[in-house]
UniProtKB/Swiss-Prot annotation:
The gene is Pggt1b. CDD domains: GGTase-I. This is Geranylgeranyl transferase type-1 subunit beta. Its cofactor is Zn(2+); Mg(2+). Its EC number is 2.5.1.59.
């Protein structure tokens, strides 16, 4: 007779404790899309990011059938900051994080309404586009040129990016968001790639990890963002020499204790099983890490009652760590989890759908070009 998750939870041994409770995590991500605890209220302006963790988490668990895809797609499109009729707000276009400003619900591609405080946010544009692709949308209502114009307006002279047009912190996180946006839209005109590459290169620290910027401390998250960005650009081996890449590999592989930490002498944290693990995967040496210790650590942070993962054992689970815990397990090919694309941070199924979408755009553009030539002659 098949063993259910409830049966396994009834056990008291360590073997039961380290089971991956897939169905619990499906329900956890469902709740993240429906109702959130009061402590999440401060994240209202970043609601689209929470939706990404939940939707991509369900996709990784092959369980997107539990959500109403069409309704969520309409909601995401309603968060698109569209150009006005005179297109005077192009530098502010992209996706906002939620409807907190009270902008009228508009999931169409019609001209947007001007609002002095309305603008896209680079991380929300990244997660918004990701969610649409995860849900099977063809991005047909995305104003691609406006998104790219808004992205160009966020790049600074040193090659880094701000989050919003008014200015904000600028660091490697937003370079990664920009790289993902350009990759998903299959158009790198949204950034000055040479400047972005220079920023990544200058962020390499004395100990060979990558920092949030030049002269700062190496960090597992920023190392992922820099390496993944270069991989999406197809420039990794042009930017760093073999010797430098070997040094980066060494820095990353030294981050493992049982799970991974992001900086020397810092505690192990679930999310770094993806940040550092995916970097090692991109650098083609993840197979030399200790899978058993990593898996045991991730599962030690699993909430066996409500699902999800926390950053540490005996802590409350949250959407971010739940998602990256699953992605960390995916890198080790855990049963019941789809494969993750280590650079784009979505399932390989979604990345393949995106590749097919790019091909369809290319075919459409070629046909349109051919038709124009035919008309001209």
């Amino acid at each position: 007779m098949a063993t259910t998750e409830d049966d396994r939870l009834a056990g008291s041994g360590e073997g039961e404790r380290l089971d991956f409770l897939r169905d619990r995590h499906v329900r956890f991500f469902q709740r993240c899309l429906q109702v959130l605890p009061e402590r999440y209220s401060s994240l209202e302006t970043s609601r689209l990011t929470i939706a990404f963790f939940a939707l991509s988490g369900l996709d990784m668990l092959d369980s997107l059938d539990v959500v109403n895809k069409d309704d969520i797609i309409e909601w995401i499109y309603s968060l698109q900051v569209l150009p006005t009729e005179d297109r005077s707000n192009l530098s502010r276009c992209g996706f906002r994080g939620s409807s907190y400003l009270g902008i009228p619900f508009n999931p169409s591609k019609n001209p947007g309404a001007a609002h002095p405080y309305d603008s896209g946010h680079i991380a929300m544009t990244y997660t918004g586009l990701s969610c649409l692709i995860i849900l099977g949308d063809d991005l047909g209502r995305v104003d691609k040129e406006a998104c790219l114009a808004g992205l160009r307006a966020l790049q600074l002279e040193d090659g880094s990016f701000c989050a919003v047009p008014e200015g904000s912190e600028n660091d490697m996180r937003f370079v990664y968001c920009a790289s993902c946006i350009c990759y998903m839209l299959n158009n790198w005109s949204g950034m000055d790639m040479k400047k972005a590459i220079s920023y990544i290169r200058r962020s390499m620290s004395y100990d060979n990890g990558l920092a949030q910027g030049a002269g700062l401390e190496s960090h597992g998250g920023s190392t992922f963002c820099g390496i993944a960005s270069l991989c999406l650009m197809g420039k990794l081996e042009e930017v760093f020499s073999e010797k430098e890449l070997n040094r980066i590999k060494r820095w990353c592989i030294m981050r493992q204790q049982n799970g991974y930490h992001g900086r020397p002498n810092k505690p192990v944290d679930t999310c770094y099983s993806f940040w550092v693990g995916a970097t090692l995967k991109l650098l083609k040496i993840f197979q030399y890490t200790n899978f058993e210790k990593n898996r045991n650590y991730i599962l030690s942070t699993q909430d066996r009652l409500v699902g999800g993962f926390a950053k540490w054992p005996d802590s409350h689970p949250d959407a971010l760590h739940a998602y990256f815990g699953i992605c960390g397990l995916s890198l080790m090919e855990e049963s019941g989890i789809c494969k993750v694309h280590p650079a784009l941070n979505v399932s390989t199924r979604t990345s393949e759908r995106l590749r097919d979408l790019h091909q369809s755009w290319k075919t459409k553009d070629s046909k349109q070009c051919s038709d124009n030539v035919h008309i001209a002659t």
